[in-house]
Amino acid sequence: MADAAVIEKLEAGFKKLEAATDCKSLLKKYLSKAVFDQLKEKKTSLGATLLDVIQSGVENLDSGVGIYAPDAEAYTLFSPLFDPIIEDYHVGFKQTDKHPNKDFGDVNTFVNVDPEGKYVISTRVRCGRSMEGYPFNPCLTEAQYKEMEAKVSSTLSSLEGELKGTYYPLTGMSKEVQQKLIDDHFLFKEGDRFLQAANACRYWPAGRGIYHNDNKTFLVWVNEEDHLRIISMQMGGDLGQVFRRLTSAVNEIEKRIPFSHHDRLGFLTFCPTNLGTTVRASVHIKLPKLAANREKLEEVAGKYNLQVRGTRGEHTEAEGGIYDISNKRRMGLTEFQAVKEMQDGILELIKMEKEM
């Protein structure tokens, strides 16, 4: 059971949320007094409490979602709060639904969406994974961070062929290596205020690192927001090549490292927005004519469940008319379906741009 000091902090946090009339987070929407009272004394076997789940959203009242899972068990123990938030965010994934088993499908279905190279600047597909038997960031010890890093770096160093590369630990990284990784846009920084408030950045930079292959088309982030972020990317629009590279990497890593998986929710991640397939397939794309008609762009994107962001990701503007467009859905469909939906949408957007 959670101790008195934690419960006191929780009570204060709940009062703060209640008083914040302009707060629009899903946490505020679904943390009723009844749910709060039901969960405030609970504790996972690794010692995580409701405070670990909600503290980022309490501190940052402008959060969109406002909760994180401190460990895998939290998704079950605190399900009266997680489930409605998951259903709301992953539109259409009801509390009775079950996420399908992993299925990359026939990877040869995927093509170069822009063979002429006129519109798509680059293509990227990523997924997140958590290592079984370890909690998520807020509950990890420094020793666990280092142990996980050792397991992951030895697994990655055994990769061959196109995936063969080098692991760069953040600890003790030289200025030259650091600058090189910044220039390649590979380096991740210590978490933003949302992650900081969730206690996701403790013992930084212990156990954190970056692996990339020699061609710089395959990248793994170790212990950033998630235990593993596996990323495949390249210039141009060859989604087929990018997706095939990602799937072969995931399959290789999976042989050596068991991943956290939930019967109903799919692959588990620190943030509930990434659950399920955890897959985000995106392009940086120039659509000058459609961009001039943002409503039309959003309408078509909506039809294919695509998310339109600015060039530098969330909360940014489109620089030089270049957008970051990706699949929105992660849950209740397979990896294959998620990427196929994105491919269909991008092909449709390019077709419209040509016809305008």
Swiss-Prot record:
It comes from Penaeus monodon (Giant tiger prawn). Its EC number is 2.7.3.3. L-arginine binds at residues 64-68, 225, 271, 314. GO terms for molecular function: arginine kinase activity; ATP binding; creatine kinase activity. Residues 119-356 form the Phosphagen kinase C-terminal domain. Residues 9-91 form the Phosphagen kinase N-terminal domain. Belongs to the ATP:guanido phosphotransferase family. GO terms for biological process: phosphocreatine biosynthetic process; phosphorylation. The keyword ATP-binding applies. The lineage of its organism: Eukaryota, Metazoa, Ecdysozoa, Arthropoda, Crustacea. It is an enzyme of class 2 (transferase). The modification N-acetylalanine is found at residue 2. ATP binds at residues 122-126, 185, 229, 280-284, 309-314. This is Arginine kinase. GO terms for cellular component: extracellular space. Keywords: Acetylation, Allergen, ATP-binding, Kinase, Nucleotide-binding, Transferase. PROSITE patterns: PHOSPHAGEN_KINASE, PHOSPHAGEN_KINASE_C, PHOSPHAGEN_KINASE_N. It comes from the Eukaryota.
